């Protein structure tokens, strides 16, 4: 990071109680969390029942509304990836949460794989996808140029070592493949 101009200080009230800074990266023009949590400890920050994308619970009105909106979103995401013609239809969803997008894609003839660092969410996702969701370390074990589509739905901003991850994903994407990033 070239310039460490503090944009905002924020506290993680949900899990760790730690205070972080959002630092403007002058080189790339976006905000970064500082200090970055260590990659091997990153999943600890999502170990809470209140982190809604890692659970299928519908305990209250907010969670019920989330599932309604998620179902609408899943249909739109599927329509989007289906608009990119591909013979093999191989999809990698990074940060797949509980695997709902993978399940919908799988039901629509996509060969799916997912990456999810949170163990609880990964277990739920594996139940939905016939064990096609793996830990982050698996990224380096996939065959080069093996995916037609790689998606990061609201995950990009959570990735540590951004350049390294982008390089890995680029190598996994087929030559005419598509990378979807939503932040």
Question: Predicted regions span which residues?
Answer:
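Short, solvent-exposed coil/turn linker segments
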Residues: 3, 47-48, 70, 132-138
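Alpha-helix initiation/capping motif
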Residues: 14, 35, 66-70, 140
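N-terminal juxtadomain amphipathic helix
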Residues: 1-60
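Charge-dense, low-complexity intrinsically disordered segments
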Residues: 19, 64, 68, 156
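Residues that form generic nucleotide/phosphate-binding pockets
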Residues: 45, 68, 72, 84
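Conserved SAM-binding loop
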Residues: 76-183
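Conserved SAM-binding loop and adjacent beta-strand
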Residues: 62-76
């Amino acid at each position: 990071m070239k310039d460490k101009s503090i944009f905002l200080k924020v506290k993680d009230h949900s899990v760790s109680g730690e205070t972080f800074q959002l630092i403007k990266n002058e080189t790339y023009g976006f905000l970064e969390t500082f200090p970055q949590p260590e990659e091997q400890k990153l999943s600890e920050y999502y170990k809470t029942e209140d982190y809604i994308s890692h659970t299928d619970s519908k305990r209250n009105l907010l969670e019920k509304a989330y599932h309604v909106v998620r179902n609408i979103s899943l249909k739109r995401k599927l329509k989007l990836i289906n608009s990119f013609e591909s013979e093999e239809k191989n999809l990698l969803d990074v940060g797949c949460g509980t695997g709902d997008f993978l399940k919908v894609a799988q039901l629509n003839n996509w060969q799916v794989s997912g990456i999810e660092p949170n163990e609880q969410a990964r277990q739920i996702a594996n139940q939905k996808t016939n064990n096609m969701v793996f830990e982050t370390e698996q990224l380096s074990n996939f065959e080069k140029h093996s995916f037609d589509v790689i998606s990061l739905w609201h995950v990009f901003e959570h990735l540590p070592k951004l350049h390294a991850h982008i390089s890995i994903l680029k190598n996994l994407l087929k030559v005419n493949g598509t990378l979807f990033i939503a932040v």
